[in-house]
Amino acid sequence: MAPGEKIKAKIKKNLPVTGPQAPTIKELMRWYCLNTNTHGCRRIVVSRGRLRRLLWIGFTLTAVALILWQCALLVFSFYTVSVSIKVHFRKLDFPAVTICNINPYKYSTVRHLLADLEQETREALKSLYGFPESRKRREAESWNSVSEGKQPRFSHRIPLLIFDQDEKGKARDFFTGRKRKVGGSIIHKASNVMHIESKQVVGFQLCSNDTSDCATYTFSSGINAIQEWYKLHYMNIMAQVPLEKKINMSYSAEELLVTCFFDGVSCDARNFTLFHHPMHGNCYTFNNRENETILSTSMGGSEYGLQVILYINEEEYNPFLVSSTGAKVIIHRQDEYPFVEDVGTEIETAMVTSIGMHLTESFKLSEPYSQCTEDGSDVPIRNIYNAAYSLQICLHSCFQTKMVEKCGCAQYSQPLPPAANYCNYQQHPNWMYCYYQLHRAFVQEELGCQSVCKEACSFKEWTLTTSLAQWPSVVSEKWLLPVLTWDQGRQVNKKLNKTDLAKLLIFYKDLNQRSIMESPANSIEMLLSNFGGQLGLWMSCSVVCVIEIIEVFFIDFFSIIARRQWQKAKEWWAWKQAPPCPEAPRSPQGQDNPALDIDDDLPTFNSALHLPPALGTQVPGTPPPKYNTLRLERAFSNQLTDTQMLDEL
């Protein structure tokens, strides 16, 4: 064997070998754990203590198991070639449909309550436009006989006035023709009726109890002014009528509904639920929540929805309260209050109205992502409607509550709060002035309702597409109207004509439901994923690395600091408890030594002779070391001599 190979073999025999050439598996594993980039294996080896080592073994094995599981799923999904097909037919719940006649009460049943008001209204129209007293001479004579000998009490309470733009601060009374001074604020309301430009405007004046604070409301159209004036008195009169009596004065379900079909199956008045609205009378809701089951449909199209024929009965319309004929329909959820006056769709007579629906569901995230509310429990406004929370319900409830607080009574067109009454002249003489002032503050967002009320986080909305067609046709009119008259029987005492009827179709255009759902842009999973990506990209860190950092910098670091502080505390306590040691006498040192006490100026030769001798310094008690003992003995001198002698031999 060559000398170099012998030396290498001897080194391998005597020195431990690590790394891939380690002689044992244990040494190989130890080398791998100390030099690998996988943090868990290294922490198993370098960790001190059995508990920490077991924890790191558990973390590492768990991470390995998760990696194997996820990789197995990826491999299985990659090599899977089978497909699955799911075919299912879904049904959509049909919404609740509320139908109201535009005319709230039959004119023949409320005429005796409104006789004086209507007579003064006709007089005002005659004074302003030369309007005839009535459509029929006989009716005019009967109204005149009723009001004969009576003073106009409605115009006396709220006078109708004509304002001339040339005369500021003055107005002419409708009935007396006298001019009067008008003070206070003047509020002009825009007209929705076309009119000829004129220098005169029509309005009325509302004052508080002491008549010192007044507000004048003017309209560019006399028709709007008279209708608004009539509506105020109408609400005051009807607020004093009991609810049961008002239900009897309005239309019954048998009178309003002539025919009914849903999803191709016949239905009748028993499938509708009564809902009394203060301004629209008796309304009827189809597929209400009071039904045992909510109806649904599995097909789209007009043949699979709701089809009804409505009897409008135009002759029973109040000529001053409403100026159009037809019905109103609103589509809503089963637990939602139908705001007919806000979002109702009008149905024309002698026409078929087709309404195609498309459902959209919206789901919003609550705080901190938005200011919506789940059920209204976090809104400090009491819900006076017997329905689920919505933004409209909150706004109307807030206004009605403010009305009761400031005016002492409730507005007629909204539900009553607990322990409140509707406004009327007898108990609340100035409620109209208070109502108008409060409504103006509400529109200008001065009551705080808009800032308190929140939107609902989840709601359903039906997008409507409306189309019209003439109904019945000229050809079918000859046989259809007699048949419908016969079907009505005793409900109708006359032959029906096309202007008394309206047909309504409500259906889903298709069964495609659109859902709008909000999701947080940065969820906790996304946050952890982004953190992991940044740590892995820039520092090659993993979850195990993060745990290692937590162990070193948050556990070991603070434990070392705590241990040092504890050691210092123990030393301080031991020093505190130890008896005090006697102090050794101080030897004069430094400037305390009198021998070093010199003047600021350098001494001269003569002055140095007079200085006192220096005090003897203390001699140290320990003798100086013997340096001879530090000399090195040549222990191998004899051995070296022997070696030299052997060489000489």
From Swiss-Prot:
Residues 1-55, 563-649 are cytoplasmic. Originally identified and characterized by its inhibition by the diuretic drug amiloride. Phosphorylated on serine and threonine residues. Aldosterone and insulin increase the basal level of phosphorylation. The chain crosses the membrane at residues 56-76, 542-562. Glycans are attached at residues 209, 497. GO terms for biological process: cellular response to acidic pH; cellular response to aldosterone; cellular response to vasopressin; intracellular sodium ion homeostasis; multicellular organismal-level water homeostasis; regulation of blood pressure; sensory perception of salty taste; sensory perception of sour taste. Changing residue 183 to S: In a patient with bronchiectasis. Residues 77-541 are extracellular. The keyword Disulfide bond applies. This is one of the three pore-forming subunits of the heterotrimeric epithelial sodium channel (ENaC), a critical regulator of sodium balance and fluid homeostasis. ENaC operates in epithelial tissues, where it mediates the electrodiffusion of sodium ions from extracellular fluid through the apical membrane of cells, with water following osmotically. It plays a key role in maintaining sodium homeostasis through electrogenic sodium reabsorption in the kidneys. Additionally, ENaC is essential for airway surface liquid homeostasis, which is crucial for proper mucus clearance. PANTHER family: AMILORIDE-SENSITIVE SODIUM CHANNEL SUBUNIT GAMMA, AMILORIDE-SENSITIVE SODIUM CHANNEL-RELATED. It is linked to Liddle syndrome 2: A form of Liddle syndrome, an autosomal dominant disorder characterized by early onset of hypertension, hypokalemic alkalosis, and suppression of plasma renin activity and aldosterone secretion. Belongs to the amiloride-sensitive sodium channel (TC 1.A.6) family. SCNN1G subfamily. This is Epithelial sodium channel subunit gamma.
